[in-house]
């Protein structure tokens, strides 16, 4: 049985931990509001960008479309870009994204495909390296970045473009977590390359589900200057950066939501543990006092 001193030390230790978890919860809550606004603001822009590309693609011969849009025409080598958080203490946030990527890797390997993995975020790299270290070709570290901006998305986009130009892959899929609510973050697989399906329509959807390409925009007839093909040459790389930027913003919002929830649960658990330890301490102290009183009374009677 633990002594009174041991129980006092444990209570003090748990209280100190509870102060830390409460502080982290407050910090995550403050950051969540800003991150949530940024993620929500990026969604319509990314969606409109996809709709514009869909409209442009209808006016351009697939042969004249940028290579990023039409792809290589093969389906042999798959690049998986897995975006997770740089830090932990956010519940199952990172594990869910890595699990989604791992399931996709297993499916591709079972189909005889070649898989390459590019990780963004330390936690995803740590998780995937346990089973698929041989497949990981590079890692992008954003730990020193205090606030993710478009520059970071452009850097990741350029890395993907460089790999594509080197004929390093045929298909590129982006994995991240879509922010649904504070307690709900949904892991998503999003097709980046190619952007054009076999039917000629721009694919800006998840691997399993296509994003709405805004029928109202597609029904409008546009005049392009100098021409649609020239605009695609500029907008396709830009769209790649925009979609990655949106994914990074969604990830930040999801991470803050998961961290706030995890720290709230940790604080509650710490409170329950403090109550249990306090009850144990009081019972043991009461028993000790009772024993001392009995000894005093017994000694007095002996006299």
Curated annotation (Swiss-Prot):
Annotated membrane topology: Peripheral membrane protein
Presence of keyword Membrane: yes
PROSITE patterns: ATPASE_GAMMA
Membrane as UniProt keyword: yes
SUPFAM superfamilies: ATP synthase (F1-ATPase), gamma subunit
Top-level taxonomic group: Bacteria
UniProt-recorded Gene Ontology molecular function terms: ATP binding; proton-transporting ATP synthase activity, rotational mechanism
HAMAP family reported in the protein's UniProt record: ATP_synth_gamma_bact
Quaternary data: F-type ATPases have 2 components, CF(1) - the catalytic core - and CF(0) - the membrane proton channel. CF(1) has five subunits: alpha(3), beta(3), gamma(1), delta(1), epsilon(1). CF(0) has three main subunits: a, b and c.
Protein name, UniProt field: ATP synthase gamma chain
């Amino acid at each position: 049985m633990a002594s009174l001193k041991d129980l006092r030390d444990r209570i003090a230790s748990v209280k100190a931990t509870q102060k830390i978890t409460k502080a982290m919860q407050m910090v995550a809550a403050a950051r969540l509001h800003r991150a949530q606004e940024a993620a929500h603001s990026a969604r319509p822009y990314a969606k409109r960008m996809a709709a514009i590309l869909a409209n442009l693609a209808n006016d351009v011969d697939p042969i004249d479309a940028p290579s990023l849009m039409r792809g290589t025409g093969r389906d042999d080598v798959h690049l998986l870009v897995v975006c997770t958080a740089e830090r932990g203490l956010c519940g199952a946030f990172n594990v869910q994204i890595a699990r989604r990527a791992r399931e996709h890797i297993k499916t591709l390997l079972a189909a005889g495909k070649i898989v390459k993995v590019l990780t963004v975020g330390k936690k995803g790299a740590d998780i995937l390296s346990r089973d698929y270290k041989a497949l990981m070709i590079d890692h992008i570290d954003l730990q020193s970045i205090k606030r993710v901006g478009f520059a970071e998305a452009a850097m990741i986009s350029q890395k993907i473009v460089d790999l594509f130009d080197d004929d390093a892959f045929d298909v590129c899929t982006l994995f991240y977590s879509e922010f649904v609510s504070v307690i709900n973050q949904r892991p998503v697989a999003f097709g980046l390359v190619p952007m054009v399906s076999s039917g000629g329509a721009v694919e800006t959807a998840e691997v399993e589900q296509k994003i709405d390409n805004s029928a109202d925009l597609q029904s409008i007839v546009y005049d392009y200057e100098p021409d649609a093909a020239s605009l695609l040459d500029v907008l396709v790389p830009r769209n790649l950066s925009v979609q990655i930027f949106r994914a990074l913003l969604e990830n930040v919002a999801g991470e803050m939501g998961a961290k706030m929830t995890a720290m709230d649960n940790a604080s509650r658990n710490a409170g329950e543990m403090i109550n249990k330890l306090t009850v144990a301490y009081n019972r043991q102290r009461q028993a000790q006092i009772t024993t001392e009183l009995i000894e005093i009374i017994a000694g007095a009677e002996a006299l």
